[in-house]
Amino acid sequence: LQLLRDVNGVTENIVRSRGGRIVKHLGDGTMAVFIDGVEAIEAGHEVIVAVSALTVGDYRPQLRAGLHTGEPRAVGDDFLGVDVNVAARVAAAAGAGELLASGATIEAAGADRYATRRRRFRAKGVPRDIEVFAVVPRYSD
């Protein structure tokens, strides 16, 4: 449980510092929202790096993250809808230490120079194929 608390603490600090908001924690995952896609991308990278520096005994966690831009429906403090499902499917498609983003996020953030197309796939509960991109940090230019 200490590792989960540490991961949540790191994630919350970075998300807030980048102008995002934690919507909820889902077991060992977190759902956050951002107004700015570039800030979401930067936060995603920062969280992945920060979490990989945490250790519990000999264990070093490897986070995976997924981003999607859309118009989810706000219900109280939560968000619902197809775009939330897309974001979850994009995150699930990421490998350890990887940040994936949907085509909508890459386009909205103008981040195509930091993205490499990975694949297109159909996901349950989503009416269209999802195109995902691996996103590399800005400092890797």
Regions found by a protein language model. Give the residues of each.
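Active-site phosphate-binding and catalytic loops of NTP-dependent enzymes
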Residues: S52-Y59
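Catalytic NTP-binding/metal-coordinating core of nucleotidyl cyclase/transferase enzymes
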Residues: L1-A43, A50
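A short glycine-enriched loop-to-beta-strand structural element that forms part of the catalytic core
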Residues: R60-R73
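Residue-level signature of catalytic and energy-coupling elements of molecular machines
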Residues: T11, G27, L67, V90, ...
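Cytosolic regulatory/linker segments at or just downstream of nucleotide-handling modules
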Residues: A96-D141
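Catalytic-core segments of nucleotide cyclases and related cyclic-nucleotide turnover enzymes
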Residues: A74-G95
